[in-house]
Regions:
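Short, conserved, surface-exposed binding loops centered on an aromatic residue
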Residues: 11-17, 32-37, 74-81
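Mg2+-dependent endonuclease catalytic cores in nucleic-acid-processing enzymes, primarily RNase H-like
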Residues: 49-169
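Flexible internal linker/loop segments at domain or repeat junctions
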Residues: 13-18, 47-53
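Short regulatory "switch" loops immediately downstream of catalytic or recognition motifs
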Residues: 7, 31, 106-107
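Structured core elements
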Residues: 24-25, 45, 88
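Short, well-ordered turn and helix-capping elements at secondary-structure junctions
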Residues: 28-32, 59, 170
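ATPase catalytic-site recognition across NTP-hydrolyzing enzymes
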Residues: 1-28
Length: 170
């Protein structure tokens, strides 16, 4: 165990309609395979209410790029129009060609084929080291019991993997 996130708090998520908005955020590991050596991709549905950050639902697995985009759709369907949702994807300078040449065409194709409104904005904000950001932003919330993982998703393999990622963090 890493120690930074020794305890994980699970709790009931308020009705989605109570959130002013929700964010779907994805981190697309490079690669187009499901082997044990490939990196994991993740897409999370997050909401903040009354000082608490809720991890409402997540997908965390090795997978294909089209599956990664499909996770956004599943999360949008889960919200079901109960509140506004903003969709973002990690997109630093190194990832931008991948975002433009691989993900955007997949999103456009799916939007056209399914006649759905799916728009993912690349998060191009220059950031510090990921580990530093996690420790600085999420650890204090977690320590105070204000980082809440959805108890209804506790047995979901994706949420289990996310909780494990937190516990391994050091």
């Amino acid at each position: 165990d890493g120690g930074v996130f020794a305890e994980i708090t699970y709790g009931k998520v308020p009705a989605l309609s109570r959130f002013k908005f929700l964010v779907i955020y994805g981190d697309p590991a490079p690669g187009e395979n499901k082997t044990k050596k490939s990196s994991t991709k993740t897409v999370c549905l997050l909401g903040k209410l009354a000082g608490r950050l809720y991890l409402i639902k997540t997908f965390l697995d090795r997978g294909l790029n089209a599956e990664f985009v499909e996770w956004y759709i599943k999360l949008l369907e889960f919200v079901g129009g109960k509140t506004t949702v903003y969709c973002y994807m990690e997109n630093n300078k190194l990832q931008d060609p991948f975002f433009q040449q691989v993900f955007q065409p997949i999103v456009r194709r799916i939007r056209r084929e399914r006649k759905i409104s799916l728009y993912i904005t690349g998060d191009e904000e220059k950031k510090t080291d990921k580990a530093t950001r996690i420790e600085a932003n999420l650890e204090p919330l977690n320590r105070e019991g204000n980082l809440i993982l959805n108890e209804a998703e506790k047995d979901n393999p994706h949420m289990k993997r996310m909780a494990e990622q937190f516990k391994l963090f050091n």
